């Protein structure tokens, strides 16, 4: 009876958390919808008097708005990619691992299993990275997200504003979303500013439009400042081929810690996110190379790394491991043992 009550309570709490997790997204959507109304109707159709200026403003605005909304949608609804089945422990191995009471034997079991996989990163103490929640050996750059309750390939962070985990499958879309958000705010601020001055001087009569135009400039500038900082930080991460987690805690390889272990050079680092074909760089479609399980590494020479030597990868078995301190709990990453 008590167990059933606890299960019902736990299920109710999970349901409430899932519902509440959409609140930040709803806030963003409402702000964007209001900005659309304020710009299109109150500014362009009511305040702007020149027909040519109206047309130019509306065309440019909608071009930016489409890409802004498209990338936001892709960031939200592109599911995080999880490690494939070859990284999961079989039922027999799982039971053997769970029933083994000696830590040193458990560690050796993971070492033996990892020998079949292209795993080059380790925990802080040099052990194979293993997720005891998902029961798998983690691919390189893969981490467990406590919010999504899953291991995510090339996890960067969990973002409440898109209610999704940002990783290999959607990092390109997230970066594009930041870029188009900055452009969206900048465009609104620059085109609204002259009318803000006119309202401030009392040269325009409409009281209702005055409120929307003034507040629109304030909101656009506020979001622009915060977004340009975040976008600049992620541009720096891309230029170094790092994730947010790797920027906070240096990856540990079999040879030891190496903060530039995945740094291939500026151009190749960009291609690791956007792909080789530049015509897809500005469009939110999947073009990141690889399958998210293994990545070219600077710390390995071409004879050791099949991704740099253009050889066949290890039968789709690609994985990563690493430890992170408690200070990163706000990034929704479970500690690894």
UniProtKB/Swiss-Prot annotation:
Residues 293-337 are annotated as: Disordered. The keyword Secreted does not apply. Autopalmitoylated (in vitro). The keyword Transmembrane applies. Residues 312-323 have a biased composition (Acidic residues). Residues 42-56, 194-210 are lumenal. In brain, expressed in both excitatory and inhibitory neurons but not expressed by glial cells. GO terms for cellular component: endoplasmic reticulum; Golgi apparatus; Golgi membrane; postsynapse; postsynaptic density. GO terms for molecular function: palmitoyltransferase activity; protein-cysteine S-myristoyltransferase activity; protein-cysteine S-palmitoyltransferase activity; protein-cysteine S-stearoyltransferase activity; zinc ion binding. Zn(2+) 1 binds at residues 131, 134, 144, 151. The chain crosses the membrane at residues 21-41, 57-77, 173-193, 211-234. Residues 129-179 form the DHHC domain. Its EC number is 2.3.1.225, 2.3.1.-. The DHHC domain is required for palmitoyltransferase activity. Palmitoyltransferase that catalyzes the addition of palmitate onto various protein substrates. Has no stringent fatty acid selectivity and in addition to palmitate can also transfer onto target proteins myristate from tetradecanoyl-CoA and stearate from octadecanoyl-CoA. Palmitoylates IGF2R and SORT1, promoting their partitioning to an endosomal membrane subdomain where they can interact with the retromer cargo-selective complex. This is Palmitoyltransferase ZDHHC15.
């Amino acid at each position: 009876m008590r167990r059933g009550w606890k299960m019902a309570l736990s299920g109710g709490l999970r349901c409430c958390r899932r519902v509440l997790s959409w609140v930040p997204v709803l806030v963003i959507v409402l702000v964007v919808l209001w900005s659309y109304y304020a710009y299109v109707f109150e500014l362009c159709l009511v305040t702007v008097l020149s027909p040519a200026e109206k047309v130019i403003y509306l065309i440019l605005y909608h071009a930016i708005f489409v890409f802004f909304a498209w990338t936001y949608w892709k960031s939200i609804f592109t599911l995080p990619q999880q490690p494939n089945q070859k990284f999961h422990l079989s039922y027999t191995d799982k039971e053997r691992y769970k029933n083994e009471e000696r830590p040193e034997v458990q560690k050796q079991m993971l070492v033996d299993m990892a020998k079949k996989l292209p795993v080059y990163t380790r925990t802080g103490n040099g052990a194979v990275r293993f997720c005891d929640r998902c029961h798998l050996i983690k691919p390189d750059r893969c981490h467990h997200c406590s919010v999504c309750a899953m291991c995510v390939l090339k996890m960067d962070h969990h973002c409440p504003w898109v209610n999704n985990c940002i990783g290999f499958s959607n990092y390109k879309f997230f970066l594009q979303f930041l870029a188009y958000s900055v452009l969206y705010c900048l465009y609104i601020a620059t085109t609204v500013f002259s009318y803000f001055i006119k309202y401030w001087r009392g040269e325009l009569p409409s009281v209702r439009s005055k409120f929307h135009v003034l507040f629109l400039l304030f909101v656009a500038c506020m979001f622009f400042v915060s977004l340009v900082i975040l976008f600049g930080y992620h541009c720096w991460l891309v230029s170094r081929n790092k994730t947010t987690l790797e920027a906070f805690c240096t990856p540990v390889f079999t040879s030891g810690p190496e903060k530039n272990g995945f740094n291939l050079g500026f151009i190749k680092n960009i291609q690791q996110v956007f792909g080789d074909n530049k015509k897809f760089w500005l469009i939110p479609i999947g073009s990141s190379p690889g399958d998210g399980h293994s990545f070219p590494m600077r710390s390995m020479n071409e004879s050791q790394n099949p991704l740099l030597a253009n050889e066949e990868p290890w039968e789709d078995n690609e994985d990563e491991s690493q430890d992170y301190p408690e200070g990163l709990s706000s990034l929704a990453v479970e500690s690894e043992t």
